[in-house]
Amino acid sequence: MVLAGVAQRPWIKSCDRAFYGSMALSAATTEAPEQTGFWALTLGGIGVVFGDIGTSPLYAFREAVAGAAGGAPASRVLVLGVLSLILWALLIVVTAKYVLLLLRADNNGEGGTLSLMALGRRALGRRSLFLLVLGVIGASMFIGDSMITPAISVLSAIEGLKIAAPALEHYVVPLTVLVLVLLFGVQSHGTAIVARFFGPVMLVWFATLAAMGAMHIMDDPSVLAAINPWYAAQFLASHGTIGLVTLGAVFLAVTGGEALYADLGHFGRRPIQTAWLGFVLPALLINYFGQGALVLSNPAALENPFYKMVPEALVLPLTLMATAATVIASQAVITGAFSLISQAVQLGLLPRFEVRYTSETNAGQIYLPRVNALLLIGVLLLVLLFQTSSRLASAYGIAVSTTMVVDGIMGFVVIWKLWRWSWPAAALVILPLVLVDAMFFSANLLKLLDGAWVPLLFGLAMAVVIWTWRRGVALLMIKSRRAEVPLDDLIGSLEKHPPHIVKGTAVFLTADAEFVPPALLHNLKHNKVLHEHNVILTIETMHTPRVEAADRIRLVKVSEKFSKVALRFGFMETPNVPKALVLARKLGWEFDIMSTSFFVSRRSLKPAAQSEMWRWQTKLFVALAKSANDATDYFQIPTGRVVEVGAQVTI
């Protein structure tokens, strides 16, 4: 196993930044409406941002009412109570918290849990371990959700076959597996071509939801009484533990709401707000109330109220449309997982994964083969283990509710410290929202033994990997520092006793520019030569999504033969070292790739007999290091210009 020292990211000077933003489908900022076209972004937002929450009507109302009824016929009070809970959950959690409040908390135009964390840590003016832990928890839970969302979404859509043709019930799981395998299989080819249809398809989907609901509200117009929050309060007060369990099912209606904030940087605040308030929210509410009216007029429809809303002849076309919508929702989650992992790698929280670019024009469209394979395995295991969307619904929600609680807590820090509100005013605004999130989180915990342990297990595994990697890298740096030589001392020694000088430029990638890179020491020791120009290169990942070209590079001339160069990248950028070094020409260094050699230090790790980490953790760290992709590829350095110097290290 070989480990590149520069790739381990201990040299990242500002670890107080976010590593999980939103899906890297575009690079629009909050000013994008003026640049790209407001309505085009609004349509794009409908296709990407609302895919997850837009497919919730397939199962959310059914699961909530069925769970509350406990096998008995659903009473009017029960149906109205559930509808009222869904309505006010959408208004409080999604509309008030995310659409009206957190969409204003952007990090240079970007949103998402980790961007919020970066804002909070910046506002505190110090490295806050508490906020970092919250960010890791939020990111870890997203990975768990990334496996459940495709499974439950596609499975619930294809279950429409049981309504259209009961004889096909046995084909639901195999067809679900087939669709998911195809979905993950095409990821390597990119989604640029089909992505342009996401907006129009979801536009038709939401219009269909509204039309279906509007037709059935007339079955029992009294269902509109559920707009009164009294029905929600009465339901919770009179149903005790059952009410709390039902709340966990009601939460299914708001899963995906966090995507509104996560995708802020892609579509802008105004397009997302317009799409939600003007189209998506009304369509969802009309459909939910239509399902409620249908169940009140025909209790037998509770078996699957969504598909019972259309004539039998239209069930199959609706199933196909629902499948398309769930595939789009799943695609958005998969892309988000790729983006999350890529940013975690960029910030040194995970080893380098192989990244393939699927678009020649948009660097944000990426494909991670290993991550894709792991997600597919996890999704298929969930489908085969749970078999139905009703069973899988028990596992859904805990990850999202955890993320929402995290967002609320960090939102308080931003409002208080960054927006400079008084803490009582900030608490007055955010505390009620956090309490609602906490209530949903508690409700989902009740489903722990029924399947909620699954995303928690996935999230825990992700958190352990991040913790192990950070701890291992830190210990590796401490061990390396003991043998390091100050750069100034070496330069002074070389000036007194100069070695043989060869033509050209040598760039040494290193963790800390104050000390001599191991590759430079090896070059002097074994080759006994020094280049005409020697550049000590460090790479910094900032706590902003992107770095302007003017701030990309810093160059300091140390001596006649030595310079220090620091390259800065945002946590959502893909580092391209040769391209960035071209900017050095403006600072006086005529960078020429053909006369430059890049020296990369690489370490081969072995578990030590005694380590500061647990034995299992040491083995995990070494395994993670072995799996790391090559630093040369990651920094996009031409392989013909790279010299690798290795050493074996025990940890």
Swiss-Prot record:
One of its GO terms (cellular component) is plasma membrane. It holds the Pfam family K_trans. One of its GO terms (molecular function) is symporter activity. Transport of potassium into the cell. Likely operates as a K(+):H(+) symporter. It comes from the Bacteria. Belongs to the HAK/KUP transporter (TC 2.A.72) family. It is found in: Cell inner membrane. This is Probable potassium transport system protein Kup 3. Disulfide bonds: none annotated.
